[in-house]
Amino acid sequence: MILPWLILIPFIGGFLCWIAEHSSKTLPRWIALLSMTLVLILSLWIWATGDFQLAPAPGGEPEWTLQFKVLWIERLGISIHLAMDGLSLLMVALTGLLGVLSVLCSWNEIQRRIGFFHLNLLWILGGVIGVFLAIDLFLFFFFWEMMLVPMYFLIALWGHSSDDGKKTRIYAATKFFIFTQASGLVMLVAILGLVFVNFNATGVITFDYATLLKTQLSPHVEWLLMLGFFVAFAVKMPVVPVHSWLPDAHAQAPTAGSVDLAGILLKTAAYGLIRFALPLFPNASAEFAPIAMWLGIIGIFYGALLSFAQTDIKRLVAYSSVSHMGFVMIGIYSGSQVALQGVVVQMIAHGLSAAALFILCGQLYERLHTRDMRKMGGLWSRMPYLPAISLFFASASLGLPGTGNFVGEFLILIGAFKVVPVIIVIATFGLVFASVYSLIMIHRAYFGPSQSDEPILGLDARELSMVLGLAVLLVLLGVYPQPVLDISAASMHGVQQWLGAALSTLAGR
């Protein structure tokens, strides 16, 4: 019964925030903070008490540590079916942590419609947790689409317009909504197609994941359905060339919106590929793998090159996310269990480091009222702590040894090298580009001639505790990643069985 509460707490908390807005300005903030802290504590309690070593038998049904199933729409075979394994637990814990931080980082930034802001913020987080727990495909799609509307409001109502005034927050919100909504509808068609193919074979309408895993598909149908899922996940990840919504959404979103977008929403796409696209369509995924990995390579270099050209610090960090998710794409489609576990570490590490960079960008914006790096400069001597902390997270995002990002990228590269050595050699050069754009960001923002002699406020205890906490977690993940690797091993072994068998069959032809 604990799984529904992980989803219900943010929804109930968000509604209470909206009601509390009329009585107090600070009460909605405390309700939101309490709600996400409760989600984080529950997920850590499950981690401490659950057994996550259950690996599925080859060709058998998936194994879950926790399950909750209630029939919802019997005629259509739709259930409220929630399940948790090691992968989904890690993602829910990450959501809880970044949810707490997104509430804290918007504490002073948001000053109007505070209750409605926290309603949207918590409903996004509730929808994300729903995506990570839903196993019924209709329920998964329901939560997938449900995240979009509150995210639209978050950007449209509380976002910032660009410094040149050309791109407004409404433009960014609408572009985000159209891209993700259109791709989601493609996935809906693919889900319905899979359900009808199963219905024609068995005479039973069902959206149950375990049942649909056994559906026999012809090669052409499997390819079409796999592409339907891939398009939706590729847009959300995002994969070049369907990435253009991301920099605009990040640049115009409030800090909490950017933290959620980079830290969690992009991970729902990688999770969707691992949980649904690969196991449901293993043969088509195996044939598609070289294309997907080359798309990952393009993303690594394209994201890095566009990062060089940015003057807006938030757009630079956004394009760096495109580059980092290219490594995730390569790891997912390599079919190597080592690389798949590297993907999990990289998802968590990128969630922590990208969230920290966007929090730091927000702290800069609150003080300087600009995101244009040409108007910064010389901040190293004028601001205590913030420049040094920014340097740490910029170094972490380029894969500094001793941080989680290094472990994730190293596992992806070493695991996939056995399978696709040429692609990995090329991808390694992407790390060189990452070091260049990270150092460009630090140099432009913090060094060089000072643009003003006015004193700048340093970080207060709330701001300092957020980024230092993330730094400690990132170093812990880099120095001792074993708990994360242990808890995700069984889940990744199951995925590797599905895709690995298909890749072996393909190689034997």
Swiss-Prot record:
Segments passing through the bilayer: 1-21, 30-50, 87-107, 123-143, 176-196, 223-243, 261-281, 288-308, 316-336, 342-362, 376-396, 422-442, 467-487
Keyword vocabulary terms for this entry: Cell inner membrane, Cell membrane, Membrane, NAD, Quinone, Translocase, Transmembrane, Transmembrane helix, Ubiquinone
Keyword NAD in record: yes
InterPro entries linked: NADH_Q_OxRdtase_chainM/4, NADH_UbQ_OxRdtase, ND/Mrp_TM
Intracellular or extracellular location(s): Cell inner membrane
Principal location: membrane
Reactions that this protein is recorded to catalyse: a quinone + NADH + 5 H(+)(in) = a quinol + NAD(+) + 4 H(+)(out)
GO biological processes: aerobic respiration; ATP synthesis coupled electron transport; electron transport coupled proton transport
A GO molecular-function annotation: ubiquinone binding
SUBUNIT field: Composed of 13 different subunits. Subunits NuoA, H, J, K, L, M, N constitute the membrane sector of the complex.
Family: Belongs to the complex I subunit 4 family.
Protein's name according to its UniProt entry: NADH-quinone oxidoreductase subunit M
